Amino acid sequence: MTANINKLARKNIQKLNPYQSARRIGGKGDTWLNANESPISVPFKGKVKVFNRYPECQPNNLLSSYANYVGLLNNQILVTRGADEGIELLIKAFCEPGKDAIIYCPPTYDMYAINAKIANVEIKEIPTFKNTWKIDLLNIRSNLNKVKLIYICNPNNPTGNIVSQEDLKSLLKVTLGQSLVIIDEAYIEFSPKNSMVNYLKTFPNLIILRTLSKAFALAGIRCGFTLAQKEVIDILHKVISPYPISTLIADIAVQSLEKKAIDDMKNRVLKLNMNRIWLIDELKKISCVKKVFDSHANYILVEFYMFKKIFQSLWQKGIILRNQNHKNNLKNCLRISIGSKSECMRLVQELKNFI
């Protein structure tokens, strides 16, 4: 019977390799440095006590809170189940299966390509330049035929680099009237001056993805935002599910956007950025480390000698890192999430033991 059920699945789904999230991969650790989560849990108490009614499709108080945070209007924002749902909804709303295409620029977040595969939308893969990780604007411009969406992660995951605003503006200009450019700013709180939010009024083809999972330390509630001009948001309203955000999630999200909570978030970011600077300096002194890439986020990409031995040994000791060896131009690389100071110190000490 199992074989018959598999045959009922769509052909592209039968061939699909699902995204391997940190939790799906597993591991039995006590030092989790593989999912770019906050090492600090932020306590919130639910204020809402009534749950017998369905929530608003788009909780107005949450829209207002986030609009105030980013300096936009409510009708320029869509609340989603993490930024991941925003990635999916954009493909669902704008790409014709078997006809249209997306562009993405590996090494980067895999869910752009996986969502396109699920929707049977063509993927045009245009890698960034090795080591600098700059986007290949000339190659992108030459491959715009059939392309509806271009996904750029900024800061980029897993490399940690920033795509310059000049490059992004050039991309937006060349695609105006033809393609939408989606800037995934999941990690932008760690480098806020590089946000493209202020350009939403200038470029109607600009869309920005945000989340509460990283700097806001709320990965467990799955709450994200799509920012765009009203016309784009109106289209996305047509394809989002009726009740995407639960009453409890909206309640916690609103609390996280209060002034004190935002101030606390900025202080956590400051500490994590200091930990990142310290960790980069320490890693550069260790003999098994071949190269440490600069980062503007809460993680570092590191190329190792004895890559496999190091990854497995740390795993067995309960220090869980993210393997990037299989990705474009990332041979022998691991991504290290910035943890607490004690977690970073433990990692450094273990790495010093390798000869």
Curated annotation (Swiss-Prot):
Modified residues (N6-(pyridoxal phosphate)lysine): K214
Enzyme class: transferase
Disulfide-bond pairs as recorded: none
SUPFAM superfamilies: PLP-dependent transferases
The keyword Amino-acid biosynthesis appears for this protein: yes
Recorded catalytic activity of this chain's protein: L-histidinol phosphate + 2-oxoglutarate = 3-(imidazol-4-yl)-2-oxopropyl phosphate + L-glutamate
GO molecular function terms listed in the Swiss-Prot or TrEMBL record: histidinol-phosphate transaminase activity; pyridoxal phosphate binding
Associated pathway: Amino-acid biosynthesis; L-histidine biosynthesis; L-histidine from 5-phospho-alpha-D-ribose 1-diphosphate: step 7/9
InterPro entries reported for this sequence: Aminotrans_II_pyridoxalP_BS (IPR001917), Aminotransferase_I/II_large (IPR004839), HisP_aminotrans (IPR005861), PyrdxlP-dep_Trfase (IPR015424), PyrdxlP-dep_Trfase_major (IPR015421), PyrdxlP-dep_Trfase_small (IPR015422)
GO biological process per UniProt: L-histidine biosynthetic process
Cofactors required: pyridoxal 5'-phosphate
A Pfam family per the record: Aminotran_1_2
EC number: 2.6.1.9
PROSITE patterns: AA_TRANSFER_CLASS_2
Keywords in alphabetical order: Amino-acid biosynthesis, Aminotransferase, Histidine biosynthesis, Pyridoxal phosphate, Transferase
Family recorded in the similarity comment: Belongs to the class-II pyridoxal-phosphate-dependent aminotransferase family. Histidinol-phosphate aminotransferase subfamily.
Subunit structure: Homodimer.
Protein name: Histidinol-phosphate aminotransferase
Species whose genome carries this gene: Buchnera aphidicola subsp. Schizaphis graminum (strain Sg)
Lineage, broadest ranks: Bacteria, Pseudomonadati, Pseudomonadota, Gammaproteobacteria, Enterobacterales
